[in-house]
Amino acid sequence: MEEEVVKSENGSLEFHDDTLSSSLQVNGVLKENENPDVDFLEDLDSYWEDINDRLTISRVVSDSIIRGMVTAIESDAAEKIAQKDLELSKIRETLLLYHVGSEENESSESRLIHDELTQGSSSSLKKKARKQLLMLVEELTNLREYIHINGSGATVDDSLGLDSSPHETRSKTVDKMLDSLKSILETVLKRKNDMELPSSWQQEHDFQKEIESAVVTSVLRSLKDEYEQRLLDQKAEFGGNRSLILGNIKEITGLRQELEAIRKSFLDHENGDEAGEVGDRKRVEQLHRKMSGSLNSVSSVWENGKHEESSTGLIPEHNETLRHMSPDEMINHFKIEMNKMKRDHDYKIQELTEQCFTFKRKYLNLTERGSFSFVGKDKELGALKKKIPFVISKLDKILMEDEKFVSEGKNDAGLKRQLDSLLLENRQLKDSLSDAAEKMSQLSQAEADHQELIRKLETDVEDSRNEASIYEDVYGCFVTEFVGQIKCTKQETDLEHSMLREAYELLLEDLARKEARKSKEDFEDSCVKSVMMEECCSVIYKEAVKEAHKKIVELNLHVTEKEGTLRSEMVDKERLKEEIHRLGCLVKEKENLVQTAENNLATERKKIEVVSQQINDLQSQVERQETEIQDKIEALSVVSARELEKVKGYETKISSLREELELARESLKEMKDEKRKTEEKLSETKAEKETLKKQLVSLDLVVPPQLIKGFDILEGLIAEKTQKTNSRLKNMQSQLSDLSHQINEVKGKASTYKQRLEKKCCDLKKAEAEVDLLGDEVETLLDLLEKIYIALDHYSPILKHYPGIIEILRLVRRELSGESKRPSG
């Protein structure tokens, strides 16, 4: 019996020791497990904070880059507009210098009124188009909101058989707005073509003025040539036979009458009623008809091209593709189309300029064949009109003096002096006419060039303004759409967050209930154990009393020991309850931490998706820009080859023209030498004639008529030779002036082509710099992705319990593997 008691005592003691050791082991494990969880969560928090900081930095950098690009584009546009405004102001000032206030007619006033009306109508059309665009944007935003709100309940409506009438009505309204925009664009094109018509009318009016002045100058030249020839004939016949003086007087009177008729014809010629120049006018009118027909044909082709482009650009299939495009793709698409339109426009402008140059060449050829040149302005014509009566008065004086000479027969020297003065005046008039013609041609060319520059600058300004307005409208549309998408995503994330919160609250309640049940069952088991132990002790006590009354003291001691053990067990149970409560609190805290970690992971997942989308967009932009740059390089290479060929052709032309100039100069020198020799011979013959006359007078001999006739024949031959040499010199001067004009034109074309090449090279350099910047951004973002992937891959065994993060890791791995393969391929 003693041994059993000892065993029981030993067993109880051993049980007590086991419980203590188990409790100590549990506490140690908990303490050991608490530290790594906390460290892991702290590492995750620090890692996510680093990622957040890097993402914020990348966002700030991308926003700053985008703002810089936008400001750069705006500054470039503003600089271009300012440059064009300055050029317009300079050109207008130069035109004001050449403009004469007395030439304003009723036609110019009507043209100004027409221009004001067209400007007012164009401004009203622009306002209408702006209103229609704003209405379209509002309708599109309403449609998107309607689709987004009713997207979740669309299946329910379809299952119930409900109609989608509001969607159809809104789509119909959008179609109506598009049709109205089409009609507005067509009206704008018609108004533009109507504005182009007065410019052609003005050109015809200018050509008519130039032709009238050319005809007047041709008539004056022909009359002056006849007058000079008659004067020379009179001079040749004057020294031989004094009996012919009366005939010369009659011819001078005839010349006076012709000059009066010319003066009268000047007055009639201002109204355009001249009968002698019908053939020349017919030729010029035919040339004007050809030019106007070509301009109208080109304008009709331009209109047809614009209508075709507008009709093809507004196909419904194309509209569907535009609806499915993203904002960046839409912007790139519109930029490509605008570049194409600019290229077509520049090509057509080049064709028109070439046609204008061809017509000008034909016109110059006609002027050279018809031997009429341009006269100065109305002031110079007025000066000529004033000189004609002065010449008539001088002719009257000559007639009076000739009559006196016939009556007296002694004033030969005075007549010769007057004839010389008249010849000098005629030469001065010729020089003034030639100078006036040159000035008129220069002024007409300058005016034509300035008008072309003004038209080009106005078209460029209108294009830039239209582009700016389109950019503003498109940017507004995309901003509104982007804000709506952000609001929708925010609502969806709020709903998901509320659903997750409710689910986690339910899970926590279930866990708390389960833990309470477990603690109650453990307490009941401990109570049952204690009751069983008490019953065993009572049985043993009774048996010990029956067997031996001697061991009562030992049993009492044993009972006291048992009571102490029971008390210690109760204390241990209370301590265990406290530990269980503390563990429950720790579990709740860990669940809260897990929930926050999941939320942070979800947000970071979204951020990583956004970053990956941005990287994909940047890669697509880089690829597109590379393709565009390659296309531009190819086009520039083709254009440069063409321009180099043209430059080579111009250089060959210049060399040939220089050779012709040298030949012409040599011929001029030869002609001058011949003229000088003939003048010397004439002076010698005159001196010999005078000496012979003096000798004859001194000898008082009768001169035979044969000698007089021989002298007259010599004088006629000498006069003919001088006339021929003068005509040849004039022809050479005209050829030299034409060659100099051609050389100047070729030089101007070469300079313009060089400027175009330099501009295109600068544009290519800018595009390459932008591509380099985008490549650097892509590389930095890829480096950031690699760092994120390495950090997440380090915690891959822990993150296996989160499938969303594993999917993100797979996507990142694919992106990185694709980027590593691309440069190798």
UniProtKB/Swiss-Prot annotation:
Descriptive protein name: WPP domain-associated protein
A GO cellular component entry from the record: mitochondrion
Assembly information from the UniProt record: Interacts with WPP1/MAF1 and WPP2/MAF2.
Sorted UniProt keywords: Coiled coil, Cytoplasm, Golgi apparatus
Natural source organism: Arabidopsis thaliana (Mouse-ear cress)
InterPro entries xrefs: WAP (IPR037490)
UniProt feature coiled coil, ranges: 124-147, 251-271, 410-521, 563-788
UniProt gene name: WAP
Keyword Lipid biosynthesis: no
Main location: Golgi
Signal peptide: none
